[in-house]
Amino acid sequence: MPICIPDELPAVNFLQNENVFVMTSTRANIQNIRPLKVLLLNLMPKKIETENQFLRLLSNTPLQVDIQLLRIDNRKCRNTPAEHLNNFYCDFEQIKHQNFDGLIVTGAPLGLVEFEDVAYWKQIERIISWAKEHVTSTLFICWAVQAALNILYGLPKFTREVKLSGVYYHSTLNPLALLTRGFDESFFAPHSRYADFPEQVVREHTDLDILSSSEDAGVYLLASKDKRMVFVTGHPEYDAGTLASEYLRDLAAGLAPKIPINYFPDNNPERKPLASWRSHGHLLFSNWLNYYVYQITPYDLTYMNPTLD
């Protein structure tokens, strides 16, 4: 959250030059505060586990956030009780006339499935199109990034021959970017995907800012210049044991997966992994909520005209 100081205080310019968010008294006196409405479109099979992961990150901020869980359709889910879905999730038809401050679209285990073969592809297209008019800022995770880049920018699907799995070093590329404010110059983040995001293709075919990348994992963090769209190609929400669970699952299925990179101590799957990305994940979501949602969303959501002014 910002600090509030007098407009004329010399520290205003000093702190702003250091990329510290300062709110002058003039702006603070006219600022209205209300809970933020955030929609979570959960595409993951283990929905309760995914809810817990994202809600943990969304809760680490002074802002009050009202969460609405959204499912893509009413088909049965093998990994989540129907009672849970019926009690806590809404369908798109129930909320399509509402506006929201934020939307999060989770990943999905669809890395080897062509877009046209995704059972709910039409629904994904519809929701992403709807979000442009009804949501201040949308955050896409992993597979959802690939889907959104195709829908919004026409980028084709790029697939790795070998699944990218592990915890990788990343670098921040713009020291003044609001989304990475407070980040270490290098940090860890987990990846678990077949999707590939060639940096040259992103630069040539979109106007997105690349805010963070990894020498081994590639592009990690992208954002539109108006802050309406954010793309995270990894999984900062993952628990310490999520990659281990995926590795053991694939091993049991006979897929001969590689041991996740830089994850198990001494590269030994028998040893308990530790989360080295937790602080980064919390800061990423805190920055998104503050700078990309709260600071630009209209007080009255009836009028969806997010602005930096």
From Swiss-Prot:
Concerning InterPro entries, the annotation shows: Class_I_gatase-like, HST_MetA, MetA_family
Tell me yes or no: is Amino-acid biosynthesis among this UniProt entry's keywords.
yes
Would the keyword Cytoplasm turn up in this protein's UniProt record?
yes
Q: Which domain of life is it from?
A: Bacteria
Q: Quick one: which pathway? A: Amino-acid biosynthesis; L-methionine biosynthesis via de novo pathway; O-succinyl-L-homoserine from L-homoserine: step 1/1
Q: Which residues cross the membrane?
A: none
What reaction(s) does this enzyme catalyze? L-homoserine + succinyl-CoA = O-succinyl-L-homoserine + CoA
Any one Pfam family here would be HTS
The protein's UniProt keywords, in alphabetical order, are: Acyltransferase, Amino-acid biosynthesis, Cytoplasm, Methionine biosynthesis, Transferase
Q: Which family does it belong to?
A: Belongs to the MetA family.
Instruction: Note the CDD domains from the entry.
Output: GATase1_HTS
Q: Where in the cell is it found?
A: Cytoplasm
Catalytic residues, per the record, are 142 (acyl-thioester intermediate), 235 (proton acceptor), 237
UniProt site positions, description: Important for acyl-CoA specificity: 111
GO CC entries: cytoplasm
Biological process per Gene Ontology, one example term:
L-methionine biosynthetic process from homoserine via O-succinyl-L-homoserine and cystathionine
Q: Where is this site: Important for substrate specificity?
A: 192
Could you tell me which PANTHER family the record lists for this protein? HOMOSERINE O-SUCCINYLTRANSFERASE (PTHR20919:SF0)
Q: Give the Gene Ontology MF terms in alphabetical order.
A: homoserine O-acetyltransferase activity; homoserine O-succinyltransferase activity
Residues recorded as binding substrate, renumbered to this chain, are: 163, 192, 249
Listed name of the protein: Homoserine O-succinyltransferase
